[in-house]
């Protein structure tokens, strides 16, 4: 059985200024705090849910 979890690369492309407080907290939870900062995270359901809430601020790439 292959239990390999795919990773996704998430890059913040828009500012969090003027966004709702919960959206800013989600960005911090994803490890993003500056424009053009990228993180590589496991493609789990919890990460997918967080990304879905702030997808308008991010660029997402499968790895």
Swiss-Prot record:
GO terms for molecular function: structural constituent of ribosome. GO terms for cellular component: cytosolic large ribosomal subunit. GO terms for biological process: translation. SUPFAM superfamilies: Ribosomal protein L30p/L7e (SSF55129). Gene3D superfamilies: Ribosomal protein L30, ferredoxin-like fold domain. Keywords: Ribonucleoprotein, Ribosomal protein. Pfam families: Ribosomal_L30 (PF00327). Coiled coil: none annotated. It comes from the Bacteria. Belongs to the universal ribosomal protein uL30 family. Part of the 50S ribosomal subunit. This is Large ribosomal subunit protein uL30. It comes from Rickettsia rickettsii (strain Sheila Smith).
């Amino acid at each position: 059985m292959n239990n390999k979890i795919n990773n996704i690369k998430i890059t913040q492309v828009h500012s969090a200024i003027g966004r709702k407080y919960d959206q800013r907290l989600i960005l911090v939870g994803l490890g993003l705090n500056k424009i053009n900062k990228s993180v590589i995270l496991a493609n789990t359901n919890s990460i997918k849910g967080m990304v879905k809430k702030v997808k308008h601020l991010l660029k997402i790439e499968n790895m």
